[in-house]
Amino acid sequence: MDKSKALEAALSQIERSFGKGSIMKLGSNENVVEIETISTGSLGLDIALGVGGLPRGRIIEIYGPESSGKTTLALQTIAEAQKKGGICAFVDAEHALDPVYARKLGVDLQNLLISQPDTGEQALEITDTLVRSGRVDVLVVDSVAALTPRAEIEGEMGDTVPGLQARLMSQALRKLTASISKSNTMVIFINQIRMKIGVMFGSPETTTGGNALKFYASVRLDIRRIGAVKEREEVIGNQTRVKVVKNKMAPPFKQVEFDIMYGEGVSKTGELVDLGVKAGIVEKSGAWFSYNSQRLGQGRENAKTFLRDNPDLAREIELSLRQNAGLIADRFLQNGGPDPDDGDGDATAEM
């Protein structure tokens, strides 16, 4: 048996044992796994994920620095699920959910289940009960860092019990994984970044709650604020970069940039302009943007305004972009790539 046949036999054996998509070629454009997904509210991120959105029946981790857009991205995913008639829940361990902002992002508050638990154990027990019901489509836990173990709450200020939160997360995820898969519920954990002390080489960044979530998550998204969107001197939004650090559904390491506008969420028209230029669908000549010889405007903001005022043209460009998703995904892969800044260091459990 030659090498290629031996390799094919090994690959088919792996797929029979562990399921289709358990091994793939990194450069493959095919959506190797037929899986139900929910849009993130960002066309570029849906394309970068390779399967058209975040997968159902899986654990997702969204992490990044403060005010980078983690909760916004989770709420936009909830809004997209609700548009399809899905039932969503929000476990607000931080006790910081702003209902006015959530409504502006398109979340139907009347049909959103919300819990503000007192302890980490209570939060994860509520999560487990909702997942086991099999009736919840998207469940968000905000955030892992706020899942404080009962022993820590009942103890004295200054008491330290090493690895308590990491053990809590590890036990909960072992219990949750099978239920999540059976119920087809998407569980999104929002996480924060901490700095490891005394790191000489590599990134000092790590995420809270130990290493268990890194292993159990099918998709990990690293979201960062990279700049401000200004109108004259006033800041009206954030320029945001999201990197797909881990992806079990399609090739990872793709990277996408978009604007998050205050009180609006992800700027869909801004994405159409940026992705259109990247795919060659929207032409850029100097400062002018045009589509099929029709001028959209001088400057990016004017082009965004034109598309906002002409929804039919915006839909036409979006359709063209979806048809060119494979080409755009290749560009994302060229821009992305594993680097030491993905927050996925070999950290020990959070103390």
UniProtKB/Swiss-Prot annotation:
GO terms for cellular component: cytosol. The gene is recA. It is found in: Cytoplasm. It comes from Rhizobium leguminosarum bv. viciae. Transmembrane segments: none annotated. This is Protein RecA. GO terms for biological process: DNA recombination; DNA repair; SOS response. Keywords: ATP-binding, Cytoplasm, DNA damage, DNA recombination, DNA repair, DNA-binding, Nucleotide-binding, SOS response. ATP binds at residues 64-71. Residues 330-351 are annotated as: Disordered. Belongs to the RecA family. Disulfide bonds: none annotated. Residues 339-351 have a biased composition (Acidic residues). The keyword ATP-binding applies. Can catalyze the hydrolysis of ATP in the presence of single-stranded DNA, the ATP-dependent uptake of single-stranded DNA by duplex DNA, and the ATP-dependent hybridization of homologous single-stranded DNAs. It interacts with LexA causing its activation and leading to its autocatalytic cleavage. It comes from the Bacteria. Pfam families: RecA, RecA_C. PROSITE patterns: RECA_1, RECA_2, RECA_3. Its main location: cytoplasm. GO terms for molecular function: ATP binding; ATP hydrolysis activity; ATP-dependent DNA damage sensor activity; damaged DNA binding; single-stranded DNA binding. InterPro entries: AAA+_ATPase, DNA_recomb/repair_RecA, DNA_recomb/repair_RecA_CS, P-loop_NTPase, RecA-like_C, RecA-like_N, RecA_ATP-bd, RecA_C_sf.
